Amino acid sequence: MYIIRKAVEYFKPKINRAYMNEALKKLTEKEKKIFLEMSDYDKFHSLEVYKKIKKTELKNNEKYSKLALLHDCGKENVSIITRVLHKLGFKTQLRNHAQRSFEKLEKVDEEVAILAKNHHNRDYSQEMDAFQECDDES
């Protein structure tokens, strides 16, 4: 069921424009540009993570709100086939997306860039554990 849901979200992401505009108010102009360059699926996913963050102890943490929106900016526009292969454990270009996210963000907000680089690292911090739970559920 998970794979079917993800496929539907990939091909037909239902982005709530009003909610997206609300979330974008958290970002600087440079951060907005990075967010808006993401694929529709990654924007949808990031907004879902952002929505979940707002229901946790991270809800007032500006850096983690930004991380929710920008953590996957390094994925760029990869195909669904690459995404499925990655989920199945094959080495794909997605394995380096956290580093590419860091590189895109480091001159914009170094702290968010460092968080993006580490958003898959377990035991990084309690805050990151809470973030990862939201990311994994989205």
Describe each region flagged by the PLM.
Residues M1-K33:
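Non-catalytic interface/linker regions that flank or bridge core catalytic/transmembrane domains
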